[in-house]
Amino acid sequence: DMVKLYKIELLHVHYAIPHAYAGYMAKQMLKDEGIKIPMVTTLHGTDITLVGNHPFYKPAVTFSINKSDVVTSVSQSLKEDTLKLFDIKKEVVVIPNFIELDNHKIEADIPCYRSVLASENERIITHISNFRKVKRIPDVIKIFYKIQQSISAKLLMVGDGPEKERAENLCNELGIADKVIFLGNSNEIDRILSYSDLFLLPSETESFGLAAL
């Protein structure tokens, strides 16, 4: 209905599972009504290496990728993983993630906001992720534990996910709960990174590492 209402000319779906499969179904429904619309599928990482590689989902992922008109990957390594793990007949084009620099400018009021989180002599260490096991959240806490033994510092944990409670418990066990601030999900990543002194991303694996970008 959205395609017909807004006269959409292209379906660009992100993640092979479930969106590519849903996109294919929508494309077939439109085809039955005489509407032909191409579909581009962009692969991001966990849809291939984690969720998509599960035996239950693998046939559907393979099918939906092969039925896409164009397939893109956010990195060369993810492309290689895709071709290794699935029987893909389509060409996979690598188009890295990017940002628009004009939209990411440091604001003049940064010092004011920084002072709310840390004193002038404290360093700010920042981690941003979806708090899943692959992000090695306990290691982030342990790394900071060693850092704060040598220098005065605060740790900002930005994001949310299944490993958050474990991280909070570890902070309490190590006696650093007063030095770690859990900010949850935020729309002010630019501002947070602008007053950070160090960004930590010790992931087990990353298809691209969007948080680092």
Locate predicted features.
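Aromatic "clamp/platform" in nucleotide-sugar-dependent glycosyltransferases that forms part
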Residues: 185, 204
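Short glycine/serine-rich donor-binding loops of glycosyltransferases
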Residues: 209-212
